[in-house]
Amino acid sequence: MTSLHQVLYFIFFASVSSECVTKVFKDISFQGGDLSTVFTPSATYCRLVCTHHPRCLLFTFMAESSSDDPTKWFACILKDSVTEILPMVNMTGAISGYSFKQCPQQLSTCSKDVYVNLDMKGMNYNSSVVKNARECQERCTDDAHCQFFTYATGYFPSVDHRKMCLLKYTRTGTPTTITKLNGVVSGFSLKSCGLSNLACIRDIFPNTVLADLNIDSVVAPDAFVCRRICTHHPTCLFFTFFSQAWPKESQRHLCLLKTSESGLPSTRITKSHALSGFSLQHCRHSVPVFCHPSFYNDTDFLGEELDIVDVKGQETCQKTCTNNARCQFFTYYPSHRLCNERNRRGRCYLKLSSNGSPTRILHGRGGISGYSLRLCKMDNVCTTKINPRVVGGAASVHGEWPWQVTLHISQGHLCGGSIIGNQWILTAAHCFSGIETPKKLRVYGGIVNQSEINEGTAFFRVQEMIIHDQYTTAESGYDIALLKLESAMNYTDFQRPICLPSKGDRNAVHTECWVTGWGYTALRGEVQSTLQKAKVPLVSNEECQTRYRRHKITNKMICAGYKEGGKDTCKGDSGGPLSCKYNGVWHLVGITSWGEGCGQKERPGVYTNVAKYVDWILEKTQTV
């Protein structure tokens, strides 16, 4: 007979199953709905695996001593349910909970924890003697194939194996089993933390097929989505994508995930309509989120249909998919009926598949397709979210713009800047006119009021200034510079990086952009003590050029401001960010560079177009 305790739990979950449930339930097991079983060292890691699994909504983790059979310890059972709920039963040692797919908080794939006296089993393919577990984890992070490791400490029973570091991998990226073993420490690679020193190759190579081992294949609308899938696949190191124009129809939109023993492609074959590239899992500072935000016009995604709803516009269709815990992708058909345009609704088809990708992609049927944005909120270190000097600006509050820093020289505010990595600040080159050495510079993070800064305020010293070698004046372009800090900063709610723009989102339409800084609020005003903010619209380069006929507005610049004036950056805001929110993630779209006056009518502010310098930024931050 079902206990009252179980019935109450069932009613509770029935009311919140489509919402965020963060609580875990000890000595409770979900019954049925099994998708697969993996092994994880903790319930927290089990939830992480569930969250990033394409279909997992619930999980049950079998803790140590949960069974008389030790081979069942540390089992992580991934589950799904059409109703998003499952019945629960009492089970000693079981820990159950929900995926974080529907939760607003950030959940990183990064796991820095190490597990004492646990041996995570896998394919042992490399062994070496190292000083400690930290060095072993670093070796794993800097090895292309390594997913996790086990280190034998100085207390390991076998003297011959002490200080031994074993690098491991499996097909799934999780251990095949986990056992208790005294004197060892196990943990995971920190590649997903953005801490690998391996080469990061961001180029996508057209007309190229990589002829190496295919470990998996999925259907994708373009090479950028294919690359993101490869990046978050446990064993993919590089890929080949066949475009819509590929001659063999059955292979169009096919994304081939690949690996090799050496970690690099062995053979490149030139073929039209194929594109190839590399996983970005190795990229230091900025492993991309598993998120596909774009819309694909005249494109139908095929898959298992979950629901059909009438909505107004593809954005609403995408939001409906995102709010449905099981929806992975969608196709929206606009209405062509003769009716009031303002009330016209189209049909939104919510869909899913076993691997989270369409089973097939078709064109020419009038659909607009895209993906759920539910994983766009996952934390890749820089996916900072906030709630919403600036001439016409308003005062900011602590934690609202955590990437904004103030650069000081001679105990006074010089310029603004943006945190893009734990040792890197991006700012404007013109800020350093006449400054020969970085030794006098101070960088303050987490500051809202300049009056807060005194001799006891913590700051970062600058190790190196890197100014673009083509910079001459702000008006001529290339107004961009990097500061490398002497020591790495710790990220907090008040001091975090902002994401760089993605090449894959180069056609993104930014409708929510803000400028921030401590500059003058009028041309002859006073420097502001409190960080100012103002929302500004972007202005096309063509229109901006008509406002500045004496200057050349290039594609390496971007303009923003109101036609009537009133809100703009001003002297003292230089180097600060033009931050734009796109699909819930803030991106550094511009760097405050130059303009005429402050908030003058028909004189928009001119900013360095960061998207045009991403390759330069990555080159400098990864080689210095």
From Swiss-Prot:
Post-translational modifications reported in the UniProt record: Activated by factor XIIa (or XII), which cleaves each polypeptide after Arg-389 into the light chain, which contains the active site, and the heavy chain, which associates with high molecular weight (HMW) kininogen. Activated by F12 (activated); the presence of negatively charged surfaces accelerates activation. Activated by F2 (thrombin); the presence of negatively charged surfaces, such as polyphosphate and dextran sulfate, strongly accelerates activation.
Glycosylation sites: N90, N126, N297, N449, N490
Domain Apple, residue spans: 20-103, 110-193, 200-283, 291-376
Key words of the record: Blood coagulation, Disulfide bond, Glycoprotein, Hemostasis, Heparin-binding, Hydrolase, Protease, Repeat, Secreted, Serine protease, Signal, Zymogen
Compartment annotation: Secreted
SS bonds (residue pairs): C20-C103, C46-C76, C50-C56, C110-C193, C136-C165, C140-C146, C200-C283, C226-C255, C230-C236, C291-C376, C317-C348, C321-C327, C382-C499, C415-C431, C513-C580, C544-C559, C570-C598
GO molecular function, one term: serine-type endopeptidase activity
Keyword Chloroplast belongs to the record: no
EC number: 3.4.21.27
CC per GO annotation: extracellular space
Signal peptide from the UniProt entry: 1-18
Family as reported in the entry's similarity comment: Belongs to the peptidase S1 family. Plasma kallikrein subfamily.
Protein name: Coagulation factor XI
Species name: Mus musculus
